[in-house]
Swiss-Prot record:
Pfam families: Glyco_hydro_9. Glycans are attached at N453. It is an enzyme of class 3 (hydrolase). It comes from Arabidopsis thaliana (Mouse-ear cress). Keywords: Carbohydrate metabolism, Cell wall biogenesis/degradation, Cellulose degradation, Glycoprotein, Glycosidase, Hydrolase, Polysaccharide degradation, Secreted, Signal. Expressed in young expanding tissues. Expressed in xylem cells, young epidermal cells and newly formed cell walls. Gene3D superfamilies: 1.50.10.10. One of its GO terms (cellular component) is extracellular region. PROSITE patterns: GH9_1, GH9_2, GH9_3. This is Endoglucanase 8. It is found in: Secreted. GO terms for molecular function: cellulase activity. InterPro entries: 6-hairpin_glycosidase_sf, 6hp_glycosidase-like_sf, Glyco_hydro_9, Glyco_hydro_9_Asp/Glu_AS, Glyco_hydro_9_His_AS. Belongs to the glycosyl hydrolase 9 (cellulase E) family.
Length: 492
């Protein structure tokens, strides 16, 4: 029996990783990288620059913030609607920065565009944090917006401004914002030292505010942010996450001491196989573990143990898996928009594989051993699934390959562009485009949708928003993955 239990996980792992899909024809990762970054230009809010490449988009929401006497123009729409949610926007910016920090050297000419994508986010976050003791965390009323189907250029729904402050704390969104600014300061350290210092100084101030005035922003702003980007996981992980990035960016002892002192209090070891805009636990442990593996910080050893636990928890074929894999090989987590989990967790696998390689280490996982090569193979399998190696034979990236989603849940993409239809298209008038069986008239190149369900089935239909809606935080970690595989299409 012992022999059988040892062999079966190995066979299952081999089947998931090495069975050649009959639908595979190899992938142009460089092209996919270019498109994954181009997607962010389709999500831009505010005054568009002269070098805007997706020409069907135009200026929008130029007066955002005016009702509160501030300028909050710019930034990104999070998904297929016209709201600017600060929590996922900050996480998107953090992950774009981490993608560049770890994999920018392999992005070639696309590195320049990736850096631009980061700066579009940080320029907005600097506006949102310009007043000490205040963070503007949302522009737009989600209920009003979701009751309409309008392109952003025509938007006439409520542009209500929401903020956190000392009396109405939000350590989660403030901690993530601090992380984003700190991570981006590393990206700009050599490219623009003055801008980098501004980002780091602001990150320091925002983190101090998040830490001193503790609380979840969904308690302060429940009716505005829930159920859309409610903090379901608590704010503790964002405080550790923000401190980890500030430590990496500043190398100040105070942040190291904060992390060590608060590891247990802020629950670094909780839900170690989760990572996304709401839950940073796995990301914290992988990020901090790099220093342990580089031999620089033995006092963080427990974070490496947590990171090893994360790795073992998501290996296909492990005895007690904490994630599921579809028959087609896709990593599946409960809830909607599954591709956000696929790209975020795959990013961590790839990042950790590189850290292990430099340290010449592996992760023992009971009957299996997670080598750096194995982790890269798992991550690459997920990327290849997204790009078309799946039972549907469908690329889940718009504009990549011959077959991809044509009816994505996205207002700007599905409603005729301003150049094609110059007159205003009103709130309810847009419903006919939402309900239309026709493909979207504007190609949101590079958008990765929520993806198939556990049976590998996908309805190419706008009303199925959990599967057909793209988000910025699906693409942000994918940029790093594609940056790596564009230069390393085979693993060793």
């Amino acid at each position: 029996m012992a022999r059988k239990s040892l062999i079966f996980p190995v066979i299952l792992l081999a089947v998931l990783l090495f069975s050649p899909p009959i639908y595979s024809a190899g992938h142009d990762y460089r092209d996919a990288l270019r498109k994954s970054i181009l997607f962010f230009e389709g999500q831009r809010s505010g005054k568009l620059p002269p070098d805007q490449r997706l020409k069907w988009r135009r200026d929008s929401a130029l007066r955002d913030g005016s009702s509160a006497g501030v300028d909050l123009s710019g930034g990104y729409y999070d998904a297929g609607d016209n709201i600017k949610f600060g929590f996922p926007m900050a996480f998107t910016t953090t992950m774009l920065s981490w993608s560049i920090i770890d994999f920018g050297k392999t992005m070639g000419p696309e590195l320049r565009n990736a850096v631009k994508a980061v700066k579009w986010g940080t320029d907005y976050l600097l506006k949102a944090t310009a007043i000490p003791g205040v963070v503007f965390v949302q522009v737009g009323d989600a209920y009003s917006d979701h009751n309409c189907w309008e392109r952003p250029e025509d938007m006439d729904t409520l542009r209500t401004v929401y903020k956190i402050d000392r009396a109405h704390p939000g350590s989660d969104v403030a901690g993530e914002t601090a992380a984003a600014l700190a991570a981006a300061s590393i990206v700009f350290r050599k490219r623009d030292p003055a801008y980098s210092r501004l980002l780091l100084d602001r990150a320091t101030r925002v983190f101090a505010f998040a830490n001193r005035y503790r609380g979840a922003y969904s308690n302060s702003l429940y009716h505005a942010v829930c159920p859309f980007y409610c903090d379901f996981n608590g704010y503790q992980d964002e405080l550790l996450w923000g401190a980890a990035w500030l430590h990496k960016a500043s190398r100040k002892r105070a942040y190291r001491e904060f992390i060590v002192k608060n590891e247990v209090i802020l629950k670094a070891g909780d839900t170690i196989n989760e990572f996304g805009w709401d839950n940073k636990h796995a990301g914290i442990n992988v990020l901090i573990s790099k220093e342990v593996l580089m031999g620089k910080a033995e006092y963080f050893e427990s974070f490496k143990q947590n990171a090893d636990g994360f790795i073992c928890s998501i290996l296909p074929g492990i005895s007690h898996p904490q994630v599921q894999y579809s028959r087609g090989g896709l990593l599946v987590k409960t809830g909607g928009s599954n591709m956000q989990h696929v790209t975020s967790l795959s990013f961590l696998l790839l990042a950790y594989s590189n850290y292990l390689s430099h340290a010449k280490k592996v992760v023992p996982c009971g009957e299996l051993t997670a080598s750096p090569s194995l982790l890269r193979q798992i991550a690459k399998r997920q990327v290849d699934y997204i790009l078309g190696d799946n039972p549907m034979g469908l690329s889940y990236m718009v504009g990549y390959g011959q077959k991809f989603p044509r009816r994505i849940h996205h207002r700007g993409s599905s409603v005729p562009s301003v150049s094609a239809h110059p007159s205003h298209i009103g709130c309810k008038e847009g419903s006919r485009y939402f309900l239309s069986p026709n493909p979207n008239p504007n190609l949101l190149v590079g958008a990765v949708v929520g993806g198939p369900n556990v049976t590998d089935a996908f309805p190419d239909s706008r009303p199925y928003f959990q599967q057909s809606e793209p988000t910025t935080y699906i693409n942000a970690p994918l940029v790093g993955l594609l940056g790596y595989f564009s230069a390393h299409s085979t693993w060793r």
